[in-house]
Swiss-Prot record:
Residues 1-43, 96-121, 165-171, 225-244, 303-322 are cytoplasmic. GO terms for cellular component: Golgi membrane. Residues 389-405 have a biased composition (Basic and acidic residues). It is found in: Golgi apparatus membrane. The keyword Transmembrane applies. Belongs to the nucleotide-sugar transporter family. CMP-Sialate:CMP antiporter (TC 2.A.7.12) subfamily. It comes from Oryza sativa subsp. indica (Rice). Its main location: Golgi. GO terms for molecular function: pyrimidine nucleotide-sugar transmembrane transporter activity. Keywords: Golgi apparatus, Membrane, Sugar transport, Transmembrane, Transmembrane helix, Transport. Residues 386-405 are annotated as: Disordered. Residues 65-74, 143, 193-203, 266-281, 344-405 are lumenal. Sugar transporter involved in the transport of CMP-sialic acid from the cytoplasm into the Golgi. May transport important nucleotide sugars such as CMP-Kdo (2-keto-3-deoxy-D-manno-octulosonic acid) in physiological conditions. This is CMP-sialic acid transporter 4.
């Protein structure tokens, strides 16, 4: 339980100072500085898998449409995806619990589950935002081609960087901000003349509706990703599968509420969550589940910026695959935009672009110094009190022991 910046254990009632966003960021930076070649290989596998899964996602969505429309409810796909991820998290928890050493706190105990649920309650926020975003993914396919959707999603990098700066106190160099500006230029180049003029939908110009959905499509998942990263890293010692169980459980609840809302407005016949599904939608559900699981590893062991930049690499795969299988044309604007995006990515992750810490290694920030001084003063008061008690006991009865026997 957290009150006034202090966390209290529900078991032993001990109190510690709650981690601030900046302290979470510093703790992660310290963990990252000790990263080994094994973790670097893990990051490479995560990026490779993410490129394939993210690249396949819009293509599977496009293949799921019949005559340009979805015969199934997008909310049902999101619900089945969350259920799939919950099952995966439970299976991995069982496997991990069987590999625990003697003396370790059991993962499947009720006390561990309840305590972890309290500590990870913040995961409900990104779960709700993800539920909204997953529905927007289907809406975006009605206005843009798969390759264009992937390019639009790259706009999230800039929004994520801004949110990381204010929420997690992350620092970016001028070169990295310039790299993000290059990313926006590359996306803008790809978007030139990408939407036909004069097309109407819902009585408005398609460009107007598309831009409104794009704004929501970029902001909502960016906020979800940053909050997800903060929630996972703030409880770094908690098993990622246990955290995923809460995250996906919340997501399944929110999507089920969406299904109930659909039943209220469209009638009981819409409650059939398997209605209109095909083999393509089953692949889509598996792809979305695998993509969400990979994202959790990115957020906990890497960072959100790397996750979004890895998604830009998937744009090439998406563009080539959509041109080969769906007949979409790769324009000059698209090729130029991709080139600028890769220049931006190289510049952002260049060693010269890293932020240099001006403070000495042993220096403390004001917040840390204050906590350090308060700890020292508390220790002095504690030792002084102990000395007073000792002198009091000695004057009363020198033969009486200080500690109970």
């Amino acid at each position: 339980m957290q009150r006034n910046g202090v966390m209290e254990c529900s078991v032993c009632h001990s109190k510690v100072v709650a981690p601030s966003p900046r302290s979470v960021s510093r703790a992660y930076d310290k963990h990252r500085s000790k990263i080994s070649s094994k973790y670097r290989a893990l990051n490479f596998l995560l990026v490779s898998g993410d490129c394939i899964l993210v690249g396949l996602q819009p293509i599977l969505v496009f293949m799921s449409k019949v005559d340009g429309k979805f015969q199934f409810s997008p909310i049902s796909v999101n619900f089945l995806t969350e259920v799939t991820k919950v099952i995966f998290a439970i299976v991995m928890l069982i496997i991990q619990s069987r590999k625990q050493k003697v003396g370790e706190k059991p993962l499947l105990s009720l006390s561990t589950f309840v305590q972890a649920a309290r500590n990870n309650a913040l995961l409900a926020v990104p779960a709700l935002l993800y539920a909204i975003n997953n529905y927007l993914k289907f809406i975006m396919q009605l206005y843009f081609s798969p390759a264009t959707v992937k390019m639009l999603s790259n706009l999230k990098v800039l929004v994520i960087a801004i949110l990381l700066k204010f929420i997690m106190r992350r620092k970016f160099s001028i070169i990295q901000w310039e790299a993000l500006a290059l990313l926006l230029i590359g996306i803008s180049v790809n978007q030139l003349s990408s939407i036909p003029d004069g097309t109407k939908s819902f009585g408005l110009a398609v460009t107007t509706i598309a831009y409104i959905y794009t704004l929501i499509f970029v902001t909502v998942p960016s906020l979800a990703s940053v909050y997800n990263e903060y929630a996972l890293k703030s409880q770094f010692d908690t098993s990622i599968y246990l955290q995923n169980l809460f995250l996906y459980g919340y997501g399944a609840i929110f999507n089920f509420l969406g299904i109930l809302g659909t039943v209220i407005f469209q009638g009981p016949e819409s409650f059939d969550i398997l209605q209109g599904h095909s083999r393509a939608t089953m692949f889509l559900i598996c792809n979305n589940a695998a993509q969400g699981i990979l994202s959790s590893f990115f957020f906990k062991y890497a960072d959100t910026i790397l996750k979004k930049y890895s998604s830009t690499v998937a744009t090439i795969f998406t563009g080539l695959a959509s041109a080969a299988f769906l007949g979409h044309t790769l324009t000059v604007n698209f090729l130029l935009g991709i080139s600028i995006v890769f220049i931006s990515m190289h510049q952002f992750f260049s060693p010269l672009a890293k932020v240099k810490d001006d403070k000495p290694a042993g220096a403390l920030e004001p917040e840390d110094a204050q906590n350090h001084r308060s700890s020292d003063s508390s220790f002095v008061n504690m030792t002084a009190g102990a000395a007073d008690d000792a002198s009091h006991l000695t004057s009363t009865d020198e033969r009486k022991p200080l500690l109970p026997i």
